[in-house]
Amino acid sequence: MPKYILLSTEPITFKLLLYGQPKLMQEQGWEVLLVSADGREIQQICRAEGVRHEVVPFVKGVNFVEDFISFWRLFTLMRKERPDVIHSYDSKAGFLGMLASNLAGVLHRIHSITEMPTNTKDPKKGLTLREKWTYANATRLWVNSTGMLTYLNTNSGVEASKFELLGSGSTLGVDLEKFNRQALKENHLVAATMRILPGENDFIILAVGQLTKRKGIEELVAAFVKSKIISKSKLVLIGAFEQEKDPISQETIQVIREHPRVVQLDSTDHVAHYLAIADVLVHASHEEGFSNVLLEAAAMQVPIICSNCIGNTSLIKQQKTGLVFPIGEVAVLKEALEFAFVKRDVLTKYAEVLFEEVVDKFDRKKVQQLQLEAYRQLAKYQEKGLP
């Protein structure tokens, strides 16, 4: 039985992003081991997926002592488990995991690039040392979108043969059974509505993600406050502040906390229920590999307004499947919000077109099968002794 290790710094990745994949692989004859830092989700994940889990401590940021301890734990784990395939899903897990597994002799080392490289704003700067080491020690680099693939082939300096795009992109597609209006529980819908407390005819503008500068929260809040529709709308932000990591201005924070037309929630396990209430989803991010929330909104047929960063425009096409505005342009975003309010029938048509595309290309079951087949091919190569 081939052995597969799935590596992430935080266990929440297995619960929210990769759920179902370990179970599917186990059912298809693989021995699966999940590896991450400790967390309260682990027992629930192991029960749901039917797989083992090993704890390796990871710390945020750069800490040479703690990072070396994590590396050594990973190296000894690889030597003990001797997996056929290791697959990492975030930058620190990729950096430490690819290096440790290479030195431990793991033949197939896959890293999923889920975020744009740090040189996106200035390609001449080249990749960071962490990115270079990660890419050098991986045997395959799975990218999230067509736009990301084009960018990396042009600007990374890494041989193009290492980069792979499975299907049309995305880490694991979208669960069309979960993000389905017919499947939502009434009590959760009521609870979501009670937290927002919309007026009878309020236009609900939803944003999901960390409240950081990189996610375009400052522009979104500014555009909303300046818009002509503010008295007839509510802005709902689902995400926590990350002031120590990527701070937004105190002025923006004050608006979020005090404006009667803005609602902020740190987190929720029921994003689908808030999408069901929303009239439009706004994703104003400055950088994106391929946003899962865009797929989730599309599956729920919620109209989308997004920035023109690479990961967004790989899915959303201007005035075909949504509205696209230049990164950081408050005035254009304001106009898009007002257009979405007035031309709801037009936005609905965009959402219908996008829904058909997502069902065809990004159904989680289809994406899972593509990944499973890729792993199977690696296992066959392993049996034949091929690289």
Residue spans of the language-model regions?
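A short, histidine- and acid-enriched strand-loop-helix "catalytic/donor-clamping" loop
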Residues: T9-F14, V59-V62, L103-K125, A138-R140, ...
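Aromatic "clamp/platform" in nucleotide-sugar-dependent glycosyltransferases that forms part
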Residues: S267, H286
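Short, structured helix-loop element that forms part of the nucleotide-activated donor/catalytic region
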Residues: Q43-R47, K234-R261, L265
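Conserved acidic donor-binding segment of nucleotide-sugar-dependent glycosyltransferases
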Residues: Q318-Q319, L323-V330, F339-D345
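Short hydrophobic beta-strand element within catalytic cores of glycosyltransferases
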Residues: P303-C306
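A conserved mid-protein helix/loop that constitutes part of the nucleotide-sugar donor-binding site
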Residues: F14-G20, F203-K226, L323, A331
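Donor nucleotide-sugar binding/catalytic pocket of nucleotide-sugar-dependent glycosyltransferases
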Residues: E54, A136-H188
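Short His-centered aromatic/hydrophobic patch
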Residues: S88-G94, I113
